[in-house]
Amino acid sequence: MTHTTDTIEDKASTIGNAMPHVEVKIIDPETGETVPPDTVGEYCARGYLVMHGYYEMPDATAETIDADGWLHTGDLASMDQRGYLTIEGRLKDMIIRGGENIYPKELEELLFGHPTVGEVAVVGLPDDKWGEVVAAFVRPAAGQSVDRDELFSYLREHLAPHKTPRHWFEVDEYPLTGSGKIQKFVLRDQWVDGQWTEMA
C-alpha cells in the first residue's frame, strides 16, 4: 500500500509496501528461493487477506497457495531495500532463452520510448536451439513507419544482445481480451501457424 507521506515518484512507480500483518517476498520462480533486493522474481504474499483457496478446486488451490500459506500471484516484481514493490510483468509472459530470463516489460518500455512506435507486444517464440527467442510485434505510431534495423540498433544501445528481438513484425491490430489487453498467446499461436511475415 502507499501512504499519504510517500513521494510522487513512489506513488507513480511502485505499488507501495506490505500492509500491516501481511508478509511479502520475491522469489526465484525456478528455485523458490528469496531473491536479493531490486531483483525481479515472482511476487508472493501471506497473511490474513490471502484467500484459503478456490471453491471446490483443490488442484488450482495447490498450484497457487503453497504448504506454508504463501500465495503465488504469478506477477513478476522487484522489491527495493525499503520494501517498496514494483510490478515488472506476468510470470507467464517471461521468456526463457537458453536459460536466461527475459522480461518483456523491459523491452516494451524501451520501445515505447521510440517516436515511431505506437504500441508493442514482446513475445517468446519457440526455438529448437534456445528454447525460446524474443519477438516484437510493433504497431507504428500515427503517421509513422517503423524500421526494423533502426529499432534493433535503438534497443542494442540499452540491452544485452540476448535480449534483443530476433523476430520483428508490424501489426495493424492486436488480438485483444474483452478488457482490451493484448493476447500474447494468440500472437505466438498465429506465428506457429505461419500467419505472420517478418518485417524486411
Annotate each PLM feature:
Residues 1-23, 36-41, 50-52, 62, ...:
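Conserved ATP-binding loop and adjacent catalytic segment of the adenylate-forming AMP-binding
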Residues 25, 32-33, 84, 181:
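Residue-level signal for well-ordered, solvent-exposed loop/turn and beta-edge residues enriched
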Residues 33-38, 42-105, 110-113, 129-130:
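Conserved ATP-binding/catalytic segment of the ANL
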Residues 114-120:
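Short acidic amphipathic segments
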Residues 95, 121-128, 132-139, 148-200:
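Conserved C-terminal "lid"/linker of ANL adenylate-forming enzymes
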